[in-house]
Amino acid sequence: MAQEVSSSVAFIHRLLYTALRGLLGDRLKRGLKKEQVSTLYQNITLVEPRLLQPYERVIRNFLREIKLQSTEMENLAIAVKRAQDKAAIQLSELEEEMDQRIQAVENESRKDEKRKAEEALTDLRRQYETEVGDLQVTIKRLKKLEEQSRQISQKQDVTALKKQIHDLTMENQKLKKELLEAQTNVAFLQSELDALKSDYADQSLNSERDLEIIREYTEDRSSLERQIEILQTANRKLHDSNDGLRSALENTYSKLNRSLRINNISPGNTISRSSPKFNHHSSQPLAYDRSFHSSYADEDCDSLALCDPLQKMNYEVDSLPESCFDSGLSTLRDNECDSEVDYKHQGEFQTLHRTEESLGGDASDTDVPDIRDEEAFDSESVASVLHWQPQGSAGEGSTLSSSRKPISALSLQTDMVDNTSKVTSQKAYKIVLAGDAAVGKSSFLMRLCKNEFQGNTSATLGVDFQMKTLIVDGEQTVLQLWDTAGQERFRSIAKSYFRKADGVLLLYDVTCEKSFLNVREWVDMVEDGTHRTIPIMLVGNKADLRDVDNAENQKCISAYLGEKLAMTYGALFCETSAKDGSNVVEAVLHLAREVKKRTEDDDSRSITSLAGSTSKKSLQMKNCCNG
């Protein structure tokens, strides 16, 4: 019995110790011992033996939960490891796919360039063979004629043979001249082929911009046509309302004249009293009619101006051009004015009708001559009303005329096309920007072409292309600026662009020694990629950061070291800052001047050598003919 109790006590001690170690961890290892656990268990046994079984159950539950948590932690660790492995595999697959795509694009571009070069070479070879064949046929004819002349006696047909030989000699010289011109044209065409490629790219971009502008103009025109239709509909409604107002005014005037005739008021007095300078000392019974007629003439002067047929026709003629434009003003106020005029005329008509009824009786046929006299007397005042113009019409007309300016898109586009034709007619020189990554090539190009600087530019992938026109020695010079990527994986692409370059802008960072040390590698790459010596401008960029780095005791590249390295390779040298724009244009101008000078020298040497070779050939032909 005692052994069982002791064994159970030891088991409980182990359970308690294991549970507390799992819960407390390192703190249990540092401070909790088995003796303390046994002491705690003995105290519980002595104080309250009934708590032993619940205590043991609690300990077992603790152990079970600890095991479950440890199992879950292991599962989570396994899952995290699997996810990391999967992500690494996917990343490697993406890198391989990107490299494959880059390689495929590079191979395709190489094949295209090779195919184009082979086609051009085949055409030149075919032309050369054709011309050589023609010359050989001519030579054979000459030899044949010489043999015939030897066989024939010297006395027979000497004059004819000399003439024939002279003609053949002239023809031979003409053919040689044409051959020289053809070879010269081929050389010029070959030099202009690159310019035409760049021109094609520019024209495609310009055509896309023109299509976008035309699309915008089409949308604007459709919206303007819709607005014109709305304005024409409103104009027709206004003309209809004017016709109604005219008929209402005629009826109102006739009834007014009749009522005045009933009250034994003369037309002259009525008109004089209705004028702005009416007599304030008139009799009291006529005060109502004078005030009514004066207010009527003041409120309806606008409608009277539109009731006259001539004035209405002039108004319609003047409004025809305005219907083709949108003034940009709302027409809601016009509708409100029309409704107010209709309401006023309706009220005046009712007031006049009530006045006529209060006076009693209708106008007789004998009143017609008086009415005619009144109309004749009132023609002057009506004519003045018919020539009425609203205040501010001149100002509004000037505003509308100033806002209705002709659309200058076509003229601007024509000017742009003319300027483009002027630019593209010149030779374009290809300048390649090279250097390590993050030396500021893209910022340099943006400052040169757009006069802008962005501090958060992204890395160039592959090659970027810009055009820039500069005045070099008083002449417009077109530059094709190719911004190459500086990363290691894009070096092969950059090297391929050196092959047809006319000049190189080799940039390094004055605050980064590694970019300066890699300049030698870039120069070797340029020399390997070109079949001739081209000008190189060594540019120390980010010169504005040198003072800051010197203040922080960081190593920078001095201008003396850059100039010394440039002298070693026979290159130009300049320090620039794309941030503040210092020496950016000057560096490109110096390089463009050197490129232009060297290209002109090469062209002159090629033409001279070509002329010399043709003269040697002609001399050999003459010697052959004379022999």
Curated annotation (Swiss-Prot):
Q: What is this protein called?
A: Ras and EF-hand domain-containing protein homolog
Does this entry carry the keyword DNA-binding? Answer: no
**Keyword Protein transport among record annotations:** no
Organism name? Mus musculus (Mouse)
Q: Which residues cross the membrane?
A: none
Identify the domain of life: Eukaryota
Coiled-coil zones = 55-245
Q: Which UniProt keywords apply?
A: Coiled coil, Cytoplasm, GTP-binding, Nucleotide-binding, Phosphoprotein
Phosphoserine: modified positions: S266, S272
**Cellular component, GO annotation:** perinuclear region of cytoplasm
Give GO MF terms, alphabetically.
Answer: GTP binding; GTPase activity
Name the residues that bind GTP.
Answer: A438, V439, G440, K441, S442, S443, N541, K542, A543, D544, A578, K579
**NCBIfam families for the chain:** small_GTP
Where is it localised? Cytoplasm, Perinuclear region
Q: What functional role does this protein have?
A: Binds predominantly GDP, and also GTP. Acts as a dynein adapter protein that activates dynein-mediated transport and dynein-dynactin motility on microtubules.
Tell me, what's a Pfam family for it? Ras
Query: How does this polypeptide assemble, per the annotation?
Result: Homodimer. Interacts with the dynein-dynactin complex.
Q: What family classification does the UniProt entry report for this protein?
A: Belongs to the small GTPase superfamily. Rab family.
